[in-house]
């Protein structure tokens, strides 16, 4: 009887321990599930940030390509502007040379005009003096007058050419100034684009480093989630085993309680028989 009680007590303790282990396993399971859920949420957040980083990286790469294209266009425009400036410089050189030649011709024409005017003045004075000279002298005077007219025409033509060359020179100088302004603007734009390109490149490097960091952290979280999943499975297995142990212990306890009840019934029956026997002996 004592052995049965002792065994029942031990079974009850085993049952309580099994229940405690099952509850602890359930607690561990819930804690692991909560932690896994938290890690999954954090992983999802990291994946979202990584996706945003990748989108920002794509945007930065697109900006970088655009900046490179703009820089190439600016360099091409600057090269075109430099070629245009060089062409204008050549044209200015040619115009200056033509202007120098025109000035030389003008100087010669003015000199001839001055000589012709002097000759005309002398001729005029001489004409008054020698009005009555021979026809030959009159012809010489006519020739000198013709030479004077030609000299005046040459001087007027030189003046017109000088004015035209000066006008062309002003136009070319204006075109040169505009070309230089465009070249300066293109150089300034190229410098701005180079600075923007440097900034974009630095941002790109920073984004690539962030992407690598997030990727490494994602791997760590995935490994930790795997570990927790394994622990969760182990906890579930232990909980299942504990539940089975509890069921088995409860079954054993029920069987022992039935046995105890049967023994009590037997003892009661024996006690009743003993009472009847003792009463019969007393009646004798």
Swiss-Prot record:
A single cellular component GO annotation: actin filament
Highest taxon above the source species: Eukaryota
Coiled-coil residues: 1-284
Record-linked Gene3D superfamilies: 1.20.5.170, 1.20.5.340
Record key words, sorted: Coiled coil, Repeat
UniProt-listed Pfam families: Tropomyosin
Molecular function, one GO term: actin filament binding
Disordered, as annotated region: 18-38
InterPro entries in alphabetical order: Tropomyosin
Tissue: Predominantly expressed in body wall muscle and heart, low in intestine, ovary and larval tail muscle.
A GO BP entry: muscle contraction
Domain text: The molecule is in a coiled coil structure that is formed by 2 polypeptide chains. The sequence exhibits a prominent seven-residues periodicity.
Assigned protein family: Belongs to the tropomyosin family.
Quaternary structure and partners: Homodimer.
The protein's role, per its UniProt record: The function of tropomyosin in smooth muscle and non-muscle cells is not clear.
Name this protein carries in UniProt: Tropomyosin, smooth muscle/fibroblast CTM1
Source organism of this protein record: Ciona intestinalis
């Amino acid at each position: 009887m004592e052995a049965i009680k002792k065994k029942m007590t031990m079974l009850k303790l085993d049952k309580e321990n099994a229940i405690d282990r099952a509850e602890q396993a359930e607690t561990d399971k819930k804690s692991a599930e909560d932690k896994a859920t938290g890690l999954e949420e954090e992983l999802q957040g990291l994946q979202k940030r990584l996706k945003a980083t990748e989108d920002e990286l794509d945007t930065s790469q697109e900006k970088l390509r655009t900046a490179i294209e703009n820089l190439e266009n600016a360099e091409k425009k600057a090269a075109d502007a430099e070629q245009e400036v060089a062409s204008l410089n050549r044209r200015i050189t040619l115009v200056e040379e033509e202007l120098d030649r025109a000035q030389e011709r003008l100087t010669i024409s003015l000199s001839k005009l001055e000589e012709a005017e002097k000759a005309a003045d002398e001729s005029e004075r001489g004409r008054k003096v020698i009005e009555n000279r021979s026809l030959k002298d009159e012809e010489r005077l006519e020739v000198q007058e013709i030479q004077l007219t030609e000299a005046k025409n040459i001087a007027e033509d030189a003046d017109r050419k000088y004015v035209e060359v000066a006008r062309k020179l002003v136009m070319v100088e204006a075109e040169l100034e505009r070309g230089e302004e465009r070249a300066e603007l293109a150089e300034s734009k190229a410098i701005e684009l180079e600075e923007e390109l440097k900034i974009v490149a630095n941002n790109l490097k920073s984004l690539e480093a962030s992407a690598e960091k997030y990727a490494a952290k994602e791997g760590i979280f995935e490994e930790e989630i795997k570990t927790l999943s394994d622990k969760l499975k182990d906890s579930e297995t232990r909980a299942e085993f504990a539940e089975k142990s509890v069921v088995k212990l409860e079954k054993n306890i029920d069987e022992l309680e039935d046995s105890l009840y049967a023994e009590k019934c037997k003892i009661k029956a024996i006690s009743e028989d003993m009472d009847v026997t003792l009463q019969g002996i007393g009646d004798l």
